[in-house]
A protein has these predicted regions:
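N-terminal Rossmann-like dinucleotide/flavin-binding domain of flavoprotein oxidoreductases
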Residues: 2-8, 45-139, 219-245, 385-387, ...
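Flexible, glycine-rich terminal cap/loop adjacent to redox cofactors
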Residues: 13-39, 51, 55-62, 368, ...
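FAD-site-proximal beta/loop scaffold in flavoenzymes
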Residues: 163-179, 266-357
């Protein structure tokens, strides 16, 4: 027998970083809030993506940087201890338990219902037990809003034999407790580049198969070129213009994988990772009960309210709305959406939805920051030169060799990197900045502030970088721009 409906002001589907942030904002607005989660509180990022992947990458990148420092390289000449790296990774993900996250939820006054949540009509969510048993269904009713924060899952291509071959997705690649002797990585994006870096550093013989022309093609072209150059020097084989037509594991679970290419060539590996994109977790959310198509991305307005839903009670934040598939950007959307839900619940007559307003996700279009944790690191925000030109903007592009900055010279021998600033000539401020080089991740927020703040070039001239730091690249870019 079903329980009587439970009423909350806000029901959130998905307890990843996006759902947690949205719930935190609605609680801050004084709204009762419950999160529904079928797996671990903390979500994909905490257990199978951002946190474990960077835990694997940190020792690999630290060793690479140490090897460039005179007097230190001999001390780090040996192989990494995979066992210690895995133990550190496991600690960072709480050994795939969510006790710490539960403590935070309780402290924030957010309720949790474990199970699979599906929409059951306007402002109603039906929750079935997480183990898939035939236990009682629980129905939650939202007085003001339901927020879908269910994220995405790995998208596997429709290839013969792929299901039986049990390939790695990003989940297996970040949680494996053994180092495959041979690893084939299919894809050329961020996950492919990072996992090729990590597993090569841990001792795998890695082959990367890229259907397109190179790595990281959504960023400035020189980024992927520099990353590929270093990977090849480290022994990674990168094949571009290469497509896979089949995969098989004929020997069973413990046997090798055979990857068949379009040209008929066969590659044998111990594991194959498909890093070929993401698909939204919307196929079993009951979207059809509110007039939406299951399985697709949810289209939202600037407040993350789902379009074409009568009553305006349904929101979608994070990867599921396809605006910017990055954890930090999803958390940003969650803060905006949570504030909008709170304002509407309080009958605020006019929300601040103008550009850069309190209830507008403007940064999704103008200032999305991203770091790729490879060697060298890639850090970018805003538009590339190609994207700016496609929008019809009048721009000027300024490039600088980061290896010429004194801070980079001191950072390590043979520092290789490049910086680019894209300036909107009509507005007089940067609309895109890209850094490639060891340690540039920590430079990115300065660029994000410049782009999101629309800081004029003439004002940036007065932002003096400390000497001798790598951040002096800002001065070099501005000098090149001013002439």
């Amino acid at each position: 027998m079903n329980q009587a409906p439970d009423e909350y002001d806000v029901v959130v589907l998905g307890a990843g970083p996006v759902g947690e942030n949205l719930a935190d904002r609605t609680r801050a607005a004084g709204l009762s809030t419950v999160i529904v989660e079928r797996e671990l509180v903390g979500g994909e990022c905490s257990y199978w993506a951002c946190v474990p992947s960077k835990s694997l990458l940190r020792p690999v990148l630290a060793r690479a940087e140490a090897r460039r420092v005179p007097g230190l390289r001999q001390a780090v000449d040996g192989p990494l201890s995979a066992a210690e790296v895995f133990a550190h990774r496991d600690k960072q993900v709480g050994n795939w338990t969510d006790g710490g996250a539960l403590t935070w939820l309780e402290s924030a006054g957010i309720d949790l219902v474990r199970g699979h949540g599906r929409l059951a009509g306007p402002q109603r969510v039906a929750v079935t037990p997480p183990d898939g048993s035939d236990g009682d269904e629980r129905v939650l009713t939202a007085r003001h809003a339901v927020a879908v924060c269910t994220g995405t899952r790995a998208a596997l291509p429709d290839l013969p034999g792929i299901a039986e071959a049990r390939p790695w997705t990003s989940r297996e690649a970040t949680s494996s407790a053994t180092v495959p002797e041979r690893l084939v990585v299919v894809g050329g994006g961020v996950v492919a580049a990072e996992m090729a870096t990590a597993w090569n550093g841990l001792g795998s013989r890695v082959t990367v198969l890229v259907r397109g022309s190179g790595l990281l093609t959504r960023i400035e072209p020189f980024a992927g070129e520099l990353v590929a150059e270093t990977l090849r020097e480290a022994g990674v084989e990168i094949r571009t213009g290469t497509s896979v037509k089949g995969v098989a594991r004929p020997g069973g679970a413990a046997g090798p994988v055979t990857v068949t290419l379009e040209n008929g060539e066969r590659l044998e590996a111990d594991e194959v990772l498909f890093a070929t994109g993401r698909t939204p977790h919307t196929e079993d959310l009951g979207l059809e009960t509110v007039g939406l198509e299951p399985g697709g991305w949810l289209t939202v307005d600037e407040t993350c309210r789902v379009r074409d839903v009568p009553g305006g009670w349904l929101y979608a934040a994070g990867d599921v709305n396809h605006r910017a598939l990055l954890t930090h950007q999803g958390k940003y959307q969650a803060r905006i959406a949570g504030a909008a839900i709170g304002a509407r619940a309080q009958d605020v007559p006019l929300l601040e939805t103008d550009r850069w307003g309190a209830h507008a996700t403007t940064a999704d279009e103008a200032a999305v920051p991203q770091v790729v944790f490879t060697d060298p690191e890639v850090a970018a925000v805003g538009l590339t030169a190609e994207q700016a030109e496609a929008e019809g903007r009048s721009i000027r592009v300024v490039d600088y060799d980061m290896g010429q900055v004194e801070g980079a010279v001191l950072y390590g021998d043979g520092y290789r990197g490049r910086a680019r600033m894209v300036v909107d000539l009509d507005r007089g401020h940067p609309i895109g900045v890209t850094f490639v080089g060891p340690g540039v991740a920590e430079l990115l927020h300065s660029a994000t502030v410049a782009v999101a703040g629309e800081v004029p070039i003439e004002r940036l001239w007065h932002a003096v970088p400390s000497f001798p730091t790598v951040s002096e690249v800002w001065l070099r870019l501005l000098e090149a721009y001013r002439g």
